[in-house]
Design a protein with these regions (language model features):
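Start-of-helix register in tetratricopeptide repeats
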Residues: 25, 59-60, 94, 128
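Register position in tetratricopeptide repeats
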Residues: 36-37, 70-72, 105-106, 135-137
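Short coil turns that delineate tetratricopeptide repeat
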Residues: 55-56, 90, 124
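Canonical tetratricopeptide repeat
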Residues: 63-64, 98, 128, 132
Length: 137
């Protein structure tokens, strides 16, 4: 009995040891194809897996992952990825708009207002950010 349990444990360990992560380039390509097909759940899954593998280093994919998370009604995840895009200064106005939208969906009104103000400071005159401000003042 002990040998059977040991054999099963050894097989599981070997399987995990030799398991390979999905190819990052393939994840990005699959995610982009899913995004173009408006399959936001699939795109979100591919992009978030890629970002986990690469330690959230890709600002473009982080932004796209935020868009997908927003489309599938996952505001906490959208906030995380839009925040990465803001920190890396990618597509800054839209990243701030996405971040603010996620905060609004999470009913974090003070942070929502602060994000819009921060977005306007970083993007003076942005029409979308400017149009959101009268709604909160």
């Amino acid at each position: 009995m002990k040998k059977l349990i040991l054999s099963i444990a050894l097989c599981c360990a070997a399987t995990n040891f030799f398991a390979q992560n999905a190819d990052p380039a393939q994840l990005v390509n699959d995610g982009k194809a899913a995004l173009e097909a408006k399959n936001y759940q699939e795109a979100y899954t591919k992009f978030s897996t890629y970002l986990t593998q690469t330690n959230n280093q890709d600002s473009v994919i982080a932004y796209n992952c935020g868009v997908c998370a927003d489309k599938i009604k996952k505001p906490a995840e959208a906030l995380k990825y839009f925040d990465i895009a803001v920190q890396k200064k990618y597509n800054l106005a839209n990243a701030y708009i996405g971040k603010a939208g996620a905060l609004k969906d999470l009913k974090k009104n003070d942070e929502y207002v602060a994000t819009l103000k921060e977005g306007l400071e970083a993007n003076p005159g942005n029409k979308t950010l400017t149009n959101c401000m009268p709604l909160i003042t």
